[in-house]
């Protein structure tokens, strides 16, 4: 039975544009001390496009070494061979409660290519892996969202443990999640508590943290609360969410973590700096 939880995505911090992991180490300890049970690195929040492969390993290791809980480590979107090498290299620091999350790196042409990519990563890891499932461009034009058929096939061949769900259409996402095997760990992303509130009855059991990156105890209360508490909290969450989206989710998150003196004290170019007025808001 998959467990009900929130998952905190970890952003990197820098000093003079070099990766620094000291604040990351302290940040994940703070998360654990305040009730977080699972953390994750992922292409977006963890800024894989701004990090070298070596730095992604350094970020991942700082989390595994200092977080006393479950760690889901993102694998950068790259060739199948390089992705397999990446997960094999995690052997130097992974623990019993460490997992990896694959990301298909290119356009969609056919499901078999995706299944082979994830299956080979699973084989290199030595067990089922997670899969990041964002919308992707089709090689023949247009876009493609992951289907329950593809995800279930990976699960039934023991290659898949769970997914980071990012279906581009909220109403269609309900049918997508409802069609998944009920033993798949489904981590809802984008919209956080509100999206999870909608998709839980379809079978989602977890969600990517929002306000929990700053105050994890709030999301623990949400998971343990009755519907009435969430309704009373909804107005505050909406204000928080709208303010973050006004300036961009990831930029706002990094700024808030800095203001709370938790991590993300500096950025790496190219990355925008929020104005003093934006940070005050």
Question: Where do the protein language model's features map onto the residues?
Answer:
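Catalytic alpha/beta core domains of metabolic enzymes, predominantly
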Residues: 124-128, 134-247
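Short, flexible micro-motifs
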Residues: 46-47, 80, 165, 213, ...
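C-terminal alpha-helical cap/extension of soluble enzyme domains
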Residues: 8-14, 30-36, 204-206, 211-281
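Alpha-helical scaffold segments in soluble metabolic enzymes
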Residues: 62, 120, 153, 221, ...
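A general structural signal for well-ordered alpha-helical segments in protein cores
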Residues: 24, 56, 60, 83, ...
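Active-site beta->alpha loop and helix N-cap motifs at the rims of alpha/beta catalytic domains
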Residues: 2-145
């Amino acid at each position: 039975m998959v467990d009900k939880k929130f998952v905190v995505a970890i952003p990197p911090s820098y000093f003079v544009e070099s990766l620094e992991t000291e604040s990351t180490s302290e940040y994940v300890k703070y998360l654990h001390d305040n009730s977080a049970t699972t953390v994750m690195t992922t292409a977006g929040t963890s800024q894989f496009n701004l990090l070298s492969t070596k730095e992604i390993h350094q970020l991942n290791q700082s989390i595994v070494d200092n977080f006393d809980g479950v760690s889901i480590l993102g694998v950068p979107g790259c060739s199948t061979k390089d992705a397999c090498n990446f997960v094999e290299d995690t052997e130097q620091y992974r623990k019993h409660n460490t997992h990896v999350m694959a990301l298909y790196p290119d356009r969609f042409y056919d499901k078999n290519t995706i299944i082979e990519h994830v299956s080979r990563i699973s084989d290199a890891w030595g067990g089922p892996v997670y899969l990041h499932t964002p919308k992707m461009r089709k090689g023949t034009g247009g876009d493609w969202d992951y289907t329950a058929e593809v995800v279930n096939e990976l699960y039934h061949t023991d290659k898949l443990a769970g997914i980071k769900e990012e279906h581009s259409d909220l109403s269609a996402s309900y049918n997508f999640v409802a069609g998944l095997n009920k033993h798949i760990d489904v981590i809802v992303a984008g919209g956080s508590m509100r999206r999870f509130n909608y998709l839980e009855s379809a079978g989602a059991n977890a969600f990517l943290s929002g306000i929990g990156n700053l105050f994890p105890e709030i999301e623990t209360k949400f998971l343990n609360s009755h519907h009435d508490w969430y309704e009373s909290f909804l107005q505050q969450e909406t204000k928080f969410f709208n303010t973050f989206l006004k300036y961009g989710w990831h930029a706002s998150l990094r700024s808030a973590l800095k203001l709370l003196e938790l991590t993300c004290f500096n950025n790496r170019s190219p990355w925008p700096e929020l104005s003093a007025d934006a940070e005050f808001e």
